[in-house]
């Protein structure tokens, strides 16, 4: 995102398969129960990290797809809602390609609640979307759950209890589709809007990521 904002890279989309992490938001990090919540994550085999954007703690694991879209924009604030709407609908369309009854909107009692969550049949959350703005760029981040909703429930029950947050574990869902198929569907939807050119992270970008790593390590 920083390199896109600086004009060093063009608009960039990254689809990644993360390890097991609980991504805490800034307001989680200042909560009284943050320490116990981070310990609960570790006890369940999840690395606690601090996230770039989003409202409350969310989960990444090997059955999820992480999406990061860095967009150059000299005045990013007026476009916040448009980016949310476009990104949420794009994820929903990708899931519908796979036969999922995907809809945009929050589910009552969902974890990390948001108006631009993507759900299945209005009942279970499949994806969450967040944004971060910097000078001359916006970052849209999302996590889409392909499989393994039970792992989300198992770790977030103690994590949210420690943070003093209420939620309904039954709202955690998954698309029930292989990651390869989910990645292909997401790529196909982005290809409808953009000319996609495959690119691998270069050394300058990796070095920048290493410098920022400590900022995202949870206590």
Where are these regions (language model features)?
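N-terminal low-complexity, intrinsically disordered segments
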Residues: 1-52, 192
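Residues forming anionic-ligand binding surfaces in small-molecule and nucleic-acid pockets
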Residues: 16-18, 60-72, 164-172
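Short acidic-glycine loop/turn motifs at beta-strand connectors
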Residues: 18, 62, 120-123, 134-135, ...
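Short, conserved charged micro-motifs
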Residues: 32-35, 76-80, 151-155, 179-181
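Short glycine-enriched loops at secondary-structure junctions
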Residues: 52-58
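Contiguous, small/hydrophobic- and glycine-enriched helical/loop subdomains that border
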Residues: 63-108
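Long, positively charged amphipathic alpha-helical accessory segments at protein N-termini or as interdomain linkers
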Residues: 98-100, 129-132, 136-219
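Beta-rich nucleic-acid/ligand-interaction surfaces
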Residues: 104-125, 205-208
């Amino acid at each position: 995102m920083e390199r896109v904002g600086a004009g060093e890279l063009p608009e960039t989309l990254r689809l990644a398969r993360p390890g097991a992490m609980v991504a805490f938001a800034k307001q989680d990090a200042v909560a009284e129960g943050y320490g116990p919540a981070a310990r609960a994550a570790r006890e369940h085999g999840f690395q606690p990290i601090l996230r770039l954007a989003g409202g409350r703690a969310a989960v990444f694991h090997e059955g999820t797809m992480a999406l990061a879209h860095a967009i150059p924009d000299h005045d990013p604030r007026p476009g916040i809602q448009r980016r949310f709407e476009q990104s949420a609908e794009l994820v929903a369309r990708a899931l519908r390609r796979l036969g999922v009854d995907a809809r945009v909107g929050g589910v009552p009692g969902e974890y990390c609640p948001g108006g631009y969550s993507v759900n299945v049949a209005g009942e279970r959350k499949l994806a969450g979307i967040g944004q971060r703005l910097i000078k001359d760029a916006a970052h849209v981040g999302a996590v889409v759950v392909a499989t393994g909703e039970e792992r989300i429930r198992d770790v977030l029950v103690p994590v949210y209890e420690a943070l003093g947050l209420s939620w309904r574990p039954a709202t955690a869902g998954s698309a029930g589709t292989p990651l390869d198929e989910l990645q292909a569907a997401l790529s196909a939807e982005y290809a409808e809007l953009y000319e996609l050119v495959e690119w691998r992270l270069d050394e300058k970008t990796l070095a920048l990521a290493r410098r920022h790593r400590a900022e995202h390590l949870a206590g």
